[in-house]
Amino acid sequence: MKRLFWIGSSRENLKEFPDEVQAEIGHGLYLAQMGDRHNHAKPLSGLGSAKIIEIRENDRSGTYRVVYTVEMAEFIFVLHAFQKK
C-alpha cells in the first residue's frame, strides 16, 4: 500500500469538507493507495506525461476536488484540496 504525503494545507482543507464528501474522497484516496481508481477520479489533461489525478465530489453545498499524483512508487502526493466556486 502506498503512503499518503500531504502537500501544504491539502489535509486541513479536506477536513473542512462536509463529512460525506470527506468519506467519499477518503475512499478514493484509499483506492489510489491500493493501485485502483475511484469512479469519480480522472486524469487531468494538459500536463504532459505527469500522472495527476483529480477526484470530484458534489453535494448540496458545492463541488469539491482533490488533486494527487501517482508518479512515485511508494507515495501518493495529495497536492491540493479545494471547493470549486
Q: Residue locations for each model-derived region?
A:
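Basic, Lys/Arg-enriched alpha-helical interface segments
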Residues: 1-63, 72-76, 85
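Portal/gating segments that form or line small-molecule/metal binding sites
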Residues: 66
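Catalytic DNA-binding helix-loop module of base-excision-repair DNA glycosylases/AP lyases
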Residues: 69
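Conserved catalytic cores of phosphodiester-cleaving nucleases, focusing on short active-site segments
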Residues: 79
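Short beta-to-alpha linker loops that shape the active-site pocket of alpha/beta-hydrolase fold enzymes
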Residues: 82
